[in-house]
Amino acid sequence: MSYLPCELHCHTIHSDGDFTVSELQKAAVDDHLAIIALTDHNTFSGWDELDDNIIPAIRGIEWTTYFGHMLVLGANDFVDWRDAQPDNIDEKIKQVKAVGGIVGIAHPYQLGSPLCTGGRWEFNVRDWRNVDYIEVWHQNLYSAKRENERALELWTSLLDKGYKIAATYGRDWHREETSGHYGCTYVDVDDISAKSVMRAIRLGKTVISHGAKFIFRVHRHGVTSGIGDTVKKGNYTFSFFTDLHSRVKDAGMEDIVYKEIKI
Protein backbone atom coordinates (compact mmCIF):
# COMPACT_ATOMS: atom_id res chain seq x y z
CA MET A 1 0.00 0.00 0.00
CA SER A 2 1.42 3.35 -1.07
CA TYR A 3 -0.81 6.38 -0.63
CA LEU A 4 0.30 9.07 -3.08
CA PRO A 5 -0.97 12.67 -3.27
CA CYS A 6 -3.12 13.85 -6.14
CA GLU A 7 -5.38 16.75 -7.09
CA LEU A 8 -8.51 15.75 -8.98
CA HIS A 9 -10.03 19.17 -9.72
CA CYS A 10 -7.94 21.58 -11.83
CA HIS A 11 -8.60 24.35 -14.36
CA THR A 12 -6.55 26.27 -16.92
CA ILE A 13 -6.97 29.09 -19.44
CA HIS A 14 -8.97 26.61 -21.51
CA SER A 15 -11.88 27.45 -19.19
CA ASP A 16 -11.81 29.94 -16.30
CA GLY A 17 -8.35 29.32 -14.86
CA ASP A 18 -5.25 31.50 -15.06
CA PHE A 19 -2.76 28.65 -15.57
CA THR A 20 -1.56 27.46 -18.92
CA VAL A 21 -1.57 23.67 -18.97
CA SER A 22 2.20 23.61 -18.58
CA GLU A 23 2.07 26.09 -15.68
CA LEU A 24 -0.53 23.94 -13.92
CA GLN A 25 1.61 20.84 -14.25
CA LYS A 26 4.73 22.62 -13.01
CA ALA A 27 2.80 24.10 -10.06
CA ALA A 28 1.64 20.57 -9.19
CA VAL A 29 5.25 19.37 -9.17
CA ASP A 30 6.20 22.28 -6.91
CA ASP A 31 3.30 21.31 -4.63
CA HIS A 32 4.72 17.78 -4.29
CA LEU A 33 1.78 16.10 -6.00
CA ALA A 34 2.21 12.77 -7.78
CA ILE A 35 -0.61 13.09 -10.34
CA ILE A 36 -3.36 15.54 -11.28
CA ALA A 37 -6.63 15.51 -13.21
CA LEU A 38 -7.27 18.27 -15.76
CA THR A 39 -10.98 19.09 -15.43
CA ASP A 40 -11.70 22.28 -17.34
CA HIS A 41 -15.32 23.37 -17.58
CA ASN A 42 -17.11 21.70 -20.50
CA THR A 43 -14.03 21.35 -22.69
CA PHE A 44 -11.32 18.85 -23.59
CA SER A 45 -9.22 21.40 -25.46
CA GLY A 46 -6.37 21.37 -22.93
CA TRP A 47 -5.73 17.65 -23.20
CA ASP A 48 -3.41 17.93 -26.20
CA GLU A 49 -1.11 20.22 -24.21
CA LEU A 50 -0.61 17.83 -21.29
CA ASP A 51 2.91 16.50 -20.90
CA ASP A 52 3.06 13.40 -18.73
CA ASN A 53 6.84 13.82 -18.53
CA ILE A 54 6.23 16.83 -16.26
CA ILE A 55 3.65 15.05 -14.11
CA PRO A 56 1.17 12.29 -15.01
CA ALA A 57 -2.31 13.63 -15.69
CA ILE A 58 -5.77 12.11 -15.90
CA ARG A 59 -7.81 13.43 -18.80
CA GLY A 60 -11.03 14.77 -17.34
CA ILE A 61 -13.74 17.38 -17.62
CA GLU A 62 -16.06 19.21 -15.25
CA TRP A 63 -19.61 19.02 -16.50
CA THR A 64 -20.83 22.51 -15.68
CA THR A 65 -24.62 22.64 -15.85
CA TYR A 66 -27.53 24.56 -14.38
CA PHE A 67 -28.15 21.71 -11.94
CA GLY A 68 -24.70 20.96 -10.57
CA HIS A 69 -21.09 20.24 -11.45
CA MET A 70 -19.94 16.69 -12.11
CA LEU A 71 -16.33 15.60 -12.56
CA VAL A 72 -15.80 13.00 -15.28
CA LEU A 73 -12.40 11.30 -15.36
CA GLY A 74 -10.89 8.94 -17.90
CA ALA A 75 -13.80 8.60 -20.33
CA ASN A 76 -12.64 7.15 -23.65
CA ASP A 77 -15.32 8.84 -25.73
CA PHE A 78 -17.48 11.94 -25.76
CA VAL A 79 -20.63 11.97 -23.64
CA ASP A 80 -22.81 15.02 -24.21
CA TRP A 81 -23.50 16.94 -20.99
CA ARG A 82 -25.65 19.59 -22.67
CA ASP A 83 -28.86 17.62 -22.33
CA ALA A 84 -28.26 16.62 -18.69
CA GLN A 85 -31.39 17.31 -16.67
CA PRO A 86 -32.30 16.68 -13.01
CA ASP A 87 -34.22 13.51 -13.82
CA ASN A 88 -31.93 11.93 -16.44
CA ILE A 89 -28.62 12.11 -14.60
CA ASP A 90 -28.60 8.37 -13.88
CA GLU A 91 -28.70 7.64 -17.60
CA LYS A 92 -25.96 10.20 -18.30
CA ILE A 93 -23.76 8.63 -15.63
CA LYS A 94 -24.33 5.19 -17.17
CA GLN A 95 -23.20 6.60 -20.52
CA VAL A 96 -19.96 7.80 -18.91
CA LYS A 97 -19.42 4.40 -17.30
CA ALA A 98 -20.00 2.70 -20.66
CA VAL A 99 -16.95 4.48 -22.10
CA GLY A 100 -14.68 3.72 -19.16
CA GLY A 101 -15.07 6.90 -17.11
CA ILE A 102 -15.66 7.52 -13.43
CA VAL A 103 -17.81 10.29 -12.00
CA GLY A 104 -17.63 12.48 -8.93
CA ILE A 105 -19.89 15.13 -7.47
CA ALA A 106 -18.07 18.44 -7.15
CA HIS A 107 -18.82 20.78 -4.20
CA PRO A 108 -22.41 19.51 -3.76
CA TYR A 109 -23.41 22.29 -1.34
CA GLN A 110 -21.59 25.24 -2.85
CA LEU A 111 -23.60 28.45 -3.02
CA GLY A 112 -26.09 28.12 -5.88
CA SER A 113 -28.60 30.40 -7.60
CA PRO A 114 -28.84 33.29 -8.00
CA LEU A 115 -25.20 34.06 -7.11
CA CYS A 116 -23.59 30.92 -8.55
CA THR A 117 -26.13 29.28 -10.83
CA GLY A 118 -25.47 25.57 -11.09
CA GLY A 119 -22.86 25.50 -8.35
CA ARG A 120 -25.03 23.42 -6.01
CA TRP A 121 -25.90 19.78 -6.75
CA GLU A 122 -29.59 19.58 -7.67
CA PHE A 123 -29.60 16.46 -9.84
CA ASN A 124 -31.89 13.66 -8.66
CA VAL A 125 -29.61 10.65 -8.36
CA ARG A 126 -31.70 7.51 -8.00
CA ASP A 127 -28.93 4.93 -8.18
CA TRP A 128 -26.00 6.00 -6.02
CA ARG A 129 -24.13 2.82 -6.94
CA ASN A 130 -23.00 4.58 -10.10
CA VAL A 131 -21.41 7.54 -8.28
CA ASP A 132 -17.72 6.86 -7.65
CA TYR A 133 -16.77 9.75 -5.37
CA ILE A 134 -17.97 12.88 -3.64
CA GLU A 135 -15.89 15.98 -3.03
CA VAL A 136 -16.47 16.21 0.72
CA TRP A 137 -13.83 18.90 1.23
CA HIS A 138 -13.66 21.81 -1.20
CA GLN A 139 -10.94 24.48 -1.36
CA ASN A 140 -9.59 25.60 2.03
CA LEU A 141 -11.03 25.90 5.54
CA TYR A 142 -12.41 22.35 5.12
CA SER A 143 -14.61 21.38 8.03
CA ALA A 144 -15.02 25.00 9.13
CA LYS A 145 -17.22 25.58 6.10
CA ARG A 146 -20.84 24.61 6.45
CA GLU A 147 -20.93 23.51 2.80
CA ASN A 148 -18.17 21.00 3.56
CA GLU A 149 -19.91 19.81 6.72
CA ARG A 150 -23.03 19.12 4.67
CA ALA A 151 -21.04 17.31 1.97
CA LEU A 152 -19.45 15.11 4.63
CA GLU A 153 -22.88 14.40 6.10
CA LEU A 154 -24.18 13.40 2.66
CA TRP A 155 -21.27 11.02 2.10
CA THR A 156 -21.62 9.49 5.57
CA SER A 157 -25.36 8.99 5.12
CA LEU A 158 -24.77 7.14 1.86
CA LEU A 159 -22.16 4.91 3.49
CA ASP A 160 -24.68 4.13 6.22
CA LYS A 161 -27.09 2.96 3.51
CA GLY A 162 -24.50 0.55 2.15
CA TYR A 163 -23.18 2.48 -0.82
CA LYS A 164 -19.45 2.34 -1.51
CA ILE A 165 -18.43 5.86 -2.53
CA ALA A 166 -14.97 7.38 -2.15
CA ALA A 167 -14.36 10.68 -0.37
CA THR A 168 -12.09 13.20 -2.11
CA TYR A 169 -10.70 16.67 -1.60
CA GLY A 170 -11.07 19.27 -4.36
CA ARG A 171 -8.80 22.28 -4.45
CA ASP A 172 -10.72 23.50 -7.50
CA TRP A 173 -7.38 24.86 -8.63
CA HIS A 174 -7.61 27.85 -10.98
CA ARG A 175 -4.49 29.87 -10.20
CA GLU A 176 -1.48 30.09 -7.93
CA GLU A 177 -2.59 31.26 -4.50
CA THR A 178 -0.36 33.28 -2.19
CA SER A 179 -2.22 32.35 0.98
CA GLY A 180 -4.37 29.58 2.35
CA HIS A 181 -3.73 26.02 3.44
CA TYR A 182 -4.74 23.49 0.82
CA GLY A 183 -4.99 19.74 1.14
CA CYS A 184 -5.07 16.84 -1.27
CA THR A 185 -6.45 13.38 -1.84
CA TYR A 186 -4.14 10.44 -1.18
CA VAL A 187 -4.84 7.36 -3.29
CA ASP A 188 -3.68 3.83 -2.56
CA VAL A 189 -1.88 2.79 -5.75
CA ASP A 190 0.99 0.54 -6.79
CA ASP A 191 1.99 2.79 -9.69
CA ILE A 192 1.28 6.33 -10.81
CA SER A 193 -1.09 6.12 -13.76
CA ALA A 194 -4.58 7.28 -14.60
CA LYS A 195 -5.76 3.68 -14.67
CA SER A 196 -4.41 2.93 -11.18
CA VAL A 197 -5.80 6.11 -9.62
CA MET A 198 -9.23 5.57 -11.14
CA ARG A 199 -9.26 1.98 -9.91
CA ALA A 200 -8.33 3.12 -6.38
CA ILE A 201 -11.17 5.65 -6.40
CA ARG A 202 -13.65 3.02 -7.58
CA LEU A 203 -12.57 0.84 -4.66
CA GLY A 204 -12.81 3.67 -2.12
CA LYS A 205 -9.08 3.63 -1.40
CA THR A 206 -8.70 7.34 -0.65
CA VAL A 207 -7.60 9.51 2.27
CA ILE A 208 -7.96 13.28 2.43
CA SER A 209 -5.87 15.58 4.59
CA HIS A 210 -4.66 19.16 4.76
CA GLY A 211 -1.58 18.20 6.75
CA ALA A 212 0.04 14.89 7.46
CA LYS A 213 -0.76 11.76 5.55
CA PHE A 214 -2.46 9.15 7.69
CA ILE A 215 -3.65 5.64 6.98
CA PHE A 216 -4.98 2.77 9.02
CA ARG A 217 -5.19 -0.98 8.63
CA VAL A 218 -6.89 -3.84 10.40
CA HIS A 219 -5.35 -7.27 10.91
CA ARG A 220 -6.92 -10.66 11.58
CA HIS A 221 -5.64 -14.22 11.14
CA GLY A 222 -2.63 -13.00 9.16
CA VAL A 223 -4.72 -10.97 6.72
CA THR A 224 -4.28 -7.19 6.50
CA SER A 225 -7.08 -4.99 5.16
CA GLY A 226 -6.94 -1.30 4.41
CA ILE A 227 -9.15 1.64 3.54
CA GLY A 228 -11.73 0.64 0.94
CA ASP A 229 -11.62 -3.06 1.78
CA THR A 230 -14.63 -4.92 3.15
CA VAL A 231 -14.16 -7.09 6.23
CA LYS A 232 -16.44 -9.40 8.15
CA LYS A 233 -17.65 -8.65 11.64
CA GLY A 234 -15.21 -9.78 14.30
CA ASN A 235 -12.24 -8.84 16.45
CA TYR A 236 -9.35 -7.13 14.66
CA THR A 237 -6.03 -5.58 15.56
CA PHE A 238 -5.99 -1.94 14.51
CA SER A 239 -2.84 -0.14 13.32
CA PHE A 240 -2.55 3.57 12.57
CA PHE A 241 0.24 5.26 10.64
CA THR A 242 0.91 8.93 10.09
CA ASP A 243 3.65 10.53 8.01
CA LEU A 244 4.27 14.05 9.31
CA HIS A 245 6.41 15.01 6.33
CA SER A 246 4.50 13.31 3.56
CA ARG A 247 3.84 16.38 1.43
CA VAL A 248 3.47 19.72 3.22
CA LYS A 249 6.82 21.30 4.00
CA ASP A 250 7.53 21.31 7.73
CA ALA A 251 4.19 19.67 8.51
CA GLY A 252 4.06 18.62 12.12
CA MET A 253 1.80 17.51 14.90
CA GLU A 254 0.20 20.93 15.08
CA ASP A 255 -1.45 20.19 11.73
CA ILE A 256 -3.41 17.24 13.12
CA VAL A 257 -6.69 17.81 14.93
CA TYR A 258 -7.56 14.37 16.21
CA LYS A 259 -11.23 15.14 16.73
CA GLU A 260 -11.42 15.80 12.98
CA ILE A 261 -9.91 12.49 11.90
CA LYS A 262 -12.85 10.56 10.50
CA ILE A 263 -12.69 6.87 9.66
Please provide the spans of the model-predicted regions.
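C-terminal functional module detector
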Residues: 1-3, 23-24, 100, 161-166, ...
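Short, structured coil segments at secondary-structure junctions
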Residues: 52-54, 130, 163, 182-183
